[in-house]
Design a protein with these regions (language model features):
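Pocket-edge positions in alpha/beta enzyme catalytic cores
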Residues: 47, 71, 225, 268-271
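A short C-terminal helix-loop "cap" of Rossmann-like NAD(P)-dependent dehydrogenase/epimerase domains
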Residues: 157, 213-222
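Short, contiguous pre-domain boundary segments
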Residues: 2-8, 259-269
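Rossmann-fold NAD(P)H-dependent dehydrogenase/reductase core
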Residues: 1-210, 288-293
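C-terminal amphipathic/interface module of NAD(P)-dependent oxidoreductases
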Residues: 267-293
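Short, flexible, mixed-charge acidic loops at enzyme active sites
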Residues: 149-155, 209-214, 251-260
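C-terminal helical subdomain
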Residues: 170, 219-263, 273-277, 281
Length: 293
């Protein structure tokens, strides 16, 4: 692994003039900063948001060529409808996510975290792939280290539900998805690349929406003491979206929570090509969306 000298920030973004980027979950937190900075660099940016009103409020504070379109990753019909509205796109940033929420199901019957964080983005990426010219960046987390994929019980029907383990599973799935996507793109002879990023420990609205009366106040207090800004947390995503990288790069702060931005390691489970392939095939069956190239 090599490190960019100094501390890379969004100020180092190259020009995105003439390019189109989609950022999911762009109405707040890391997604908002990612969209704003890409627009500042000259990109045409589509803010893909479940709540259009919040998306429009975020858009009002941005300059450049930006627009909001509805996308609910917990509803595959919404994912398909969104994909149908998209023309050519250069960069897709799979940023949206939920964290450690109480047990609930998506509209399609998936456990909400694996459904939103992984399966929704899996379907979106494959539906858009014929229209993507450059790369796909998926936001994972250090919490992938706590994750384990249960291919027989992805939706926590047989296991006692654990909000944090379910979150870790979904973030591990993001990395396995990225690796298998990169492999399939290369095998298809595509010039499109796939990368992942993690923000370190950034204070965002995710920690305030766990739905846990004990956990939420704890994380909000931790944010004030230890959390970096969303501006800092978006830097790995922006790096992954803009730099010349080997396929399947994983970008984050060097020291985990903080540090210079560059390639970082991942857990042994996240490096399993066998599990990545099995998860991909299961995801195709569950979403009824296949690799299109």
């Amino acid at each position: 692994m090599s490190w960019t000298p100094g501390s890379w920030t969004s100020a180092d973004l190259p020009s995105f003039a003439g390019r189109t980027a989609i950022v999911t979950g762009a109405n707040s937190g890391l997604g908002l900063v990612t969209a704003r900075e890409l627009a500042r660099a000259g990109a045409r940016v589509i803010l893909a948001c479940r709540n259009v009103d919040k998306g429009n409020a975020a858009l009002a504070g941005m300059g450049g060529d930006v627009q909001v379109r509805p996308l609910d990753l917990a509803d595959l019909a919404s994912v398909r409808a969104f994909a149908d509205t998209i023309g050519v796109v250069d960069v897709l940033v799979n940023n949206a996510g939920i964290m450690a929420v109480p047990n609930a199901l998506t509209r399609d019957g998936f456990e909400s975290q694996i459904g939103t964080n992984h399966l929704g983005h899996f379907a979106l990426t494959n539906l858009l792939l014929p229209k993507i010219s450059d790369r796909v960046v998926t936001v994972s987390s250090l919490m992938h280290y706590s994750g384990a994929i249960s291919l027989k019980d992805l939706n926590w029907k047989a296991r006692p539900y654990s909000a944090w383990l379910a979150y870790g599973q979904s973030k591990l799935a993001n990395l396995l998805f990225t690796s298998e996507l990169a492999r399939r793109l290369a095998a298809a002879g595509s010039t499109v690349t796939a990368h992942a990023a993690h923000p370190g420990y950034s204070a965002t609205n995710l920690q305030g929406h766990t739905g846990n009366p004990i956990g939420t106040p704890f994380w909000l207090a931790a944010n004030k003491l230890f959390g970096a800004s969303a501006e800092y947390g978006a830097n790995p995503t922006l790096y992954a979206a803009s730099q010349d990288l080997p396929p399947d790069s994983f970008i984050g702060p060097k020291f985990g929570a903080r540090g210079p931005i560059g390639p970082v390691g991942r857990s042994p489970l996240a490096r399993s090509s066998k599990t990545a392939g099995e998860l991909w095939r299961l995801s195709e069956r569950l979403t009824e969306v296949e690799f299109p190239l």
